Amino acid sequence: MPLRPDRTARLLPALLAAWLCLAPAAAEERAPAVELTVYTTAEQEHLRLYKDAFEKANPGIHIHWVRNASGVLTDRLLAEREAGGADAVWGLAATSLIRLGREGLLLPYAPAGLEAIDPRFRDTADTPAWIGTNIWSSVVCLNRAAHPGVPAPTAWRDLADPAFRGLVSMPNPLSSGTGYLMVAGWIQMMGEEEAWRFMDALDLNVETYAISASKPCRMAAVGRVAAGLSFEYRAAQLKAEGAPIDILLPAEGLGWDMEAAAVLRWTDAPEAARRLMDFAASEAANRLYATNYAIVAHTGVTPSLEFLPPGLKDRLLAQDIAWASDNRERILAEWRRRYGAKVEEP
């Protein structure tokens, strides 16, 4: 039966209201998802955790990770300055981001909640080019169960003892940010001349300069070397799994760097990339970082990492990460000249 005109008139407002409610939802369903290509050095086992948490908080934005070592990604970003590539970085060394910022490759942005980020964990500009997420530092993984003849070192210089001949591994600083923070830390701690003398003596004991920061500690865990120079997360994780290692914090101090996040200048999805930055700086994200690292950027989050010796925060060197960034190419060129023959091939 046809509707009477008066009834039709009464129904039209309700139908229009229903259509207005449904149309945005339908349009949202039809809108294609945005995919962000994000360069990272974060540990493989952390990437799914970060991706799932971000995508749950930001429906319609998907992360495509590209993971590699810090030095490799830094060189790649410098090479991509004209053609572009990634949209953002999340988990790249601050020493790298300082350089990328000075080269004009970053898009400054003040993420939501910036006021809760420790000022030491961000670019100093009013609108920061990058923000830090967590600190990671150098440690020594020692396996005396497999190598009872080696002494227990209390200082970095102790690793030059001939008792460690062929029984030390450290990350290759040409590819690994952890390797570079060790070298830059020794130079700032000892002075250049003394630091190169120490590294000459250490090189006599090094079995290999490993391609990744995790590998030296893994090598110590299985007894391939006695001392694996690595970083605190991997050391604590392997010890939690039952590896027969002691985690040592050398008395002179620990080199360190920050993992950090930034939007890249050439991104085709700047709004989505800014939402990534908002999440990277959030308390929720920092609670994820705090399950893996001893020091995070958010002032309202206190990590508690099992199996690490007490006092790690107090052992961090009072180092200048801007200096480490500015001198990276010079230091690495000299390091390659002296020790490149022992670098592990990919």
Where are these regions (language model features)?
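A ligand-binding cleft/hinge motif common to bilobed small-molecule-binding domains
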Residues: T95-R99, A221, V225-P244, Y293
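A bilobed periplasmic-binding-protein/Venus flytrap-type ligand-binding module shared by bacterial periplasmic
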Residues: C141-A146, A184, D257-A269, L288-Y289
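Extracytoplasmic ligand-binding site segments that recognize negatively charged/polar headgroups
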Residues: T41-R48, G71, G85-R224
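Early extracytoplasmic/lumenal segment of secretory-pathway proteins
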Residues: E28-I98
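Extracellular/periplasmic bilobal clamshell ligand-binding domains
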Residues: E306-P346
